[in-house]
């Protein structure tokens, strides 16, 4: 009976170590994919030709409430 318990304990230890080994690369791959996606979105946001058409409408409305004219300049709203 004691031998069976020792064998079961060793089997459980081997299985748990294999699970830990498999989990680390998976988590690392998910983190890498998330950081790549974040960097792509950040790069797109830095390009004003993609963001200004969306922001310009909000900027014009914002500046119109201030009775000024608004322009989108590098993703910033400039009221003049």
From Swiss-Prot:
Signal peptide (residue range): 1-21
Statement: the UniProt record of this protein carries the keyword Secreted: yes
Site description Important for antimicrobial activity, but not for insecticidal activity, residues in chain: 36
Site (Important for both antimicrobial and insecticidal activities): 42
Keyword Disulfide bond part of the UniProt annotation: yes
Residues of the BetaSPN-type CS-alpha/beta domain: 49-80
Feature type site, description Important for insecticidal activity, but not for antimicrobial activity: 74-75
Tissue expression: Expressed by the venom gland.
Record GO terms (molecular function): toxin activity
Protein family membership: Belongs to the long chain scorpion toxin family. Class 2 subfamily.
Name of protein: Peptide LaIT2
Organism (species): Liocheles australasiae (Dwarf wood scorpion)
């Amino acid at each position: 009976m004691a031998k069976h318990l020792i064998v079961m304990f060793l089997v459980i230890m081997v299985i748990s170590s294999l699970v830990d080994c498999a989990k680390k690369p998976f988590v690392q791959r998910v983190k890498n994919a998330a950081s790549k996606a974040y960097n792509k979105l950040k790069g797109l946001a830095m390009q004003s030709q993609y963001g200004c058409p969306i922001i310009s409408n909000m900027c014009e409305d914002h500046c119109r409430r201030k009775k000024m004219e608004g322009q989108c300049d590098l993703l910033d709203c400039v009221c003049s």
